[in-house]
Amino acid sequence: MKKLVIFETNNKDGIMSRSKKFYPDTYSEEDIKQDFLKVRQKVGEKYGFSGLKILQPAQKDVEANLDYPDGTYKRIDDTCLLKEDLWYETIPADILVIDSNYQNIVIGHRAADCPVIIAEDRKKQVVAVSHSGALQINRKVPMYTISALQKEAGSNLNDIYVYIGSCIKKSSYVYDRYPNWATNVSVWENCIEKKENLYHIDLVTAIINQLNIPKDHITISPVDTYKNQDYYSHLSEVKKESKPIGQNFVGAFNKER
């Protein structure tokens, strides 16, 4: 019998990114590569998988020079597992899907304020993962994440459970004007609230509105990545606050019970 393990990293674990801006100016690309591998190996030892066995989608809002239809997903198969270090596997998609035949292969995404959602069909033991920040919510990636399970596994909505990872919460995510990325009006209805000339953005509710599954099947991390000193936060980085800069990771993998 398999079980799904869901985990998150934070700044206590180390930087889950190869972006040069997170490392000392003196670091070469090889220095970054080696430091990053050590972090992944340490995380793998902590949770019980190989740090070389982590896959994430190459998302068009996140990576450069990518395009594909909204909601594109990839079901993990043997062709995705050919490289020794799977972090360097490029899979252009919004969503990754994996079944319980693939054990100890992590699917997830790095993030530093954006929610990552993990949707599990517990009956059919199939899992879908997507990075669902504001841009992705605007183009309905959470909805497509559920749809990927329905298309790939014939999932019943009543069998799907969702985890919404640690992210910036409404009290912290504030604009002084209506955000120009919020172009899909129906998506943001009642999720962007104006208070005293400031706009408070509720990413979590906007995600939940797209899932269409029983509310008691949804687990939400209580962590606000901006306020919690243990988590990397993009907003904190932009504001040049005192927190360390970097990226967290939210992922899931199957293992034997």
Where are the predicted features?
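Active-site microenvironment for binding and transforming phosphate-containing groups
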Residues: M1-R257
